[in-house]
Amino acid sequence: MAGGGSDLSTRGLNGGVSQVANEMNHLPAHSQSLQRLFTEDQDVDEGLVYDTVFKHFKRHKLEISNAIKKTFPFLEGLRDRELITNKMFEDSEDSCRNLVPVQRVVYNVLSELEKTFNLSVLEALFSEVNMQEYPDLIHIYKSFKNAIQDKLSFQESDRKEREERPDIKLSLKQGEVPESPEARKESDQACGKMDTVDIANNSTLGKPKRKRRKKKGHGWSRMGTRTQKNNQQNDNSKADGQLVSSEKKANMNLKDLSKIRGRKRGKPGTHFTQSDRAPQKRVRSRASRKHKDETVDFQAPLLPVTCGGVKGILHKEKLEQGTLAKCIQTEDGKWFTPMEFEIKGGYARSKNWRLSVRCGGWPLRRLMEEGSLPNPPRIYYRNKKRILKSQNNSSVDPCMRNLDECEVCRDGGELFCCDTCSRVFHEDCHIPPVESEKTPWNCIFCRMKESPGSQQCCQESEVLERQMCPEEQLKCEFLLLKVYCCSESSFFAKIPYYYYIREACQGLKEPMWLDKIKKRLNEHGYPQVEGFVQDMRLIFQNHRASYKYKDFGQMGLRLEAEFEKDFKEVFAIQETNGNS
């Protein structure tokens, strides 16, 4: 967070500010359009510039973030130009005050800018103020300019090559006679071959090799010389003879193309080109169909399925119940869900059973798209008939609330619905993890309601000394889940950044975070309630001790206050003046 002068001095640049100023003299003025930001040519294709700089920006976000040592004036400039919102600006500043490294904050901002990238992003990034404040941006700016120039040079080289090549149709135009069907057919074949040679000269597997392209270009020039000589020899002939000779020359030139290429299609060493790829794809497609089983009746209620070397029978009716229904029966009589069948087949890493599991050689997703197979809902409702009564006595399906939102993380995905209330959870977001095999399954909110409502008030010291029996375990799990439901919990879920900073972590006790407590709790690693409460409070103690600014840390204070309030309510702790 040092000032601009100290940043320049620490860089160890020869000449210091004067060298930076000298570099700045060669940079474009901020008022110039981005089309001329990296090139002096006004006629450059702006689409080409955009595509090139976007890819370069995407690949060099890490270098850019490393060049920016402090947030001012980088973040302020983005906010003033309305490239980031005030909320993003404030969140970024808060993260820095919370000792999150500046480079990490800048990288996150660049990642957001990438999603809505436009050319004004680079105008702001390479503004005169930023270039003076962050000298390391100068060489990054030059890398953008070099990327543009290389792209333009490559395009210009290709354009000149095309101009130097003879026009295959020239001999036909000189004769001013319409093509016969045979000549047109041969001409089309020649054009296809010419395009193949052209593309092969320009790239090999998409990587340009200019030396090779130049060598090929010489071959085309020799052919052009021969064509011109042939044309000169026929200039003195009569009109009728010229018409005949022009057609013959066209056929001759078309046949010569295969000789110039030097290789026949299909032999080893042939370049992969756009002309070659199309028929190859069709051949592969036809070949792949040979492995499909055309005898399978996809409309049948039972379908044979495979995954790797495992075979089974898929029951459509069971699949309609949801992705967690055991709808596939293997040869040994065991039942599996689609995901379990995928794992048994050796495709656990795929995590996409719709593609891993096949029927008649086709992935199940293809059958679902064609309507031959039902697409099961992402949420598995064990009891679809359950209906709650609202205040106006109208029937309300409880699963209509938050169908696509986990109660804890507020995100979508594969969700599990409680059989008593309308809440849905990810399997691992719920504490303890959802028991998918248990029917009916009740979430922890419903289980807490079922527990005895009236409790005798007691001192906190008495609560902390309790053994972790099932009832106390349930209460601790509920407390932790309530913390995860708070938006502030995301910062404390993983190990905080300040544990990696030597100056910040000095004097701190054992590193502690929510996921670590969650793992211990799920493994029944706390013999007493005291151990759980101590770990929770340790998170907030370490957070307070790591503050750089006393007026900051509202995020941790709010979460701590919420936990203490819930702790007293759940365990019916009696308030005392000396209670912390």
UniProtKB/Swiss-Prot annotation:
GO molecular function: DNA binding; DNA-binding transcription factor activity, RNA polymerase II-specific; zinc ion binding
PTM-bearing positions, type Phosphoserine: 180
Zinc finger extent (PHD-type): 403-449
Cross-link (Glycyl lysine isopeptide (Lys-Gly) (interchain with G-Cter in SUMO2)): 169, 292
PROSITE patterns, alphabetized: BROMODOMAIN_2, HSR, SAND, ZF_PHD_1, ZF_PHD_2
One Gene Ontology CC term in the entry: nucleus
Keyword Phosphoprotein (UniProt): yes
Domain HSR: 33-149
Keywords recorded for this protein, A-Z: Bromodomain, DNA-binding, Isopeptide bond, Metal-binding, Phosphoprotein, Ubl conjugation, Zinc, Zinc-finger
Record carries keyword ATP-binding: no
Domain Bromo stretches: 467-570
Coiled coil: none
GO biological process assignments: regulation of transcription by RNA polymerase II
Biased composition (Polar residues): 224-236
Residue ranges of domain SAND in the record: 293-374
Record's compositionally biased regions (Basic and acidic residues): 156-170
Region called Disordered, residue ranges: 155-293
Biased composition annotated in UniProt, kind: Basic residues: 207-219, 280-290
Protein name in UniProt: Nuclear body protein SP140-like protein
Gene label: SP140L
